Amino acid sequence: MANEERTIPETNVASERPEDPVESQTRAEGGEQIQEAAPETAELEAVQQLLEDARSKADEHWNELLRARAELENQRRRHERELEKGRKYALEKFAQDLLPVKDSLEMGLAAAQAEDANVTALREGTELILKMFNEVAARFGIETIDPQGEAFNPDFHQAISTQESSEAAPDTVLTVVRKGYALNGRLLRPAMVVVSKPGEQTTAGVDTQA
């Protein structure tokens, strides 16, 4: 018994070796970095998603803008076509009403060229044509300016000469050379007139010669 060897329990030297502080700190920092990387990745993905959403909305708004611009351009072109059509055919009704007047003038001219033309009939026909024209003009707001005997109005009358008159007041229209016309009160052309002016007053002279 005395000679029995004592068995010394083996121990793992490596496991009992003290841990290197530097290695421990490195592992700790690595773990922390892994833990910190996860939130950063999630945040980056969220930012990328927001960016994609913003790009999608920007594309949508851009397409809406393009459609709106195209619609405005189409409306502008339609408006221009309507204006052009309005300018081109604005006098269509007036022209249609004038055609009978032209027809009557042509018939009157043909009658005047006949060998047995009746002057009285031609005059009456001409008066009828003039009446037709005046009726057409009145329907479209054309007014005749015939200021015979009226006071001279430079807004509607054009004086081409003056004439002395002892009977008419100064600046009175004595003669209408050419009638004027207005459209709904707006002057088309002035009436050409002769206007009165005061006559020269003569005074009896005194003979101073003896």
Curated annotation (Swiss-Prot):
Coiled-coil regions, chain positions: none
Keyword Cytoplasm: yes
Span list, region Disordered: 1-42
Subunit record text: Homodimer.
Pfam families referenced in this protein's UniProt entry, alphabetically: GrpE
InterPro entries: GrpE, GrpE_coiled_coil, GrpE_head
Gene it is expressed from: grpE
Protein name: Protein GrpE
Any one of the GO BP annotations: protein folding
Principal cellular location given in the protein's record: cytoplasm
Subcellular location: Cytoplasm
Any one Gene Ontology cellular component term annotated for this protein: cytosol
Role noted for this protein: Participates actively in the response to hyperosmotic and heat shock by preventing the aggregation of stress-denatured proteins, in association with DnaK and GrpE. It is the nucleotide exchange factor for DnaK and may function as a thermosensor. Unfolded proteins bind initially to DnaJ; upon interaction with the DnaJ-bound protein, DnaK hydrolyzes its bound ATP, resulting in the formation of a stable complex. GrpE releases ADP from DnaK; ATP binding to DnaK triggers the release of the substrate protein, thus completing the reaction cycle.
Biological source species: Nitrosococcus oceani (strain ATCC 19707 / BCRC 17464 / JCM 30415 / NCIMB 11848 / C-107)
Swiss-Prot/TrEMBL keywords: Chaperone, Cytoplasm, Stress response
Similarity comment: family membership: Belongs to the GrpE family.
GO molecular function, a single term: protein homodimerization activity
